[in-house]
Amino acid sequence: MVQNIIQEIDRIAQAQPDFPAFDELGTIHSYGDLYHYSNALAAWLDQQNLPANSPILIYGDHQFEMMASFIGCLKAGHAYIPVETDSALPRVKSILTTAAPQMVLAVDDFPADELDFTGTVVNHDQLVDLLHQEVDYQLDHFVDGDDL
């Protein structure tokens, strides 16, 4: 029985790195891709001086970068808040006010000006560059159990 999804994803990635993890409109992304991209993001997040366990808003749709960002945030010890691009601005504003994330990972264009968001916004191009970094990441402080 799976005890922790992060550890299970990493186990599959190491045992079968080419096994399909995500099909994005016919583009197949493997568990190896998910492992490497999420590790790269987690390593970068660890260097950002974010408060421990602080949530990170991830803005996008159904792209692979969303999944990699979810896992990367969890590996770095941060909860993630997924927000779809078709969400109404008042709803997004409410989420920002309630959860108070200091960072947004914008898989799609994030309307920071319209929302008066003053935290860090990592745009799509920056995020893709981060995800493609080669890192040696040690999974030692991920979100687990009741951490959320």
PLM segments and residue spans:
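Carrier-protein-dependent adenylate-forming modules in NRPS/ANL systems
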Residues: 1-148
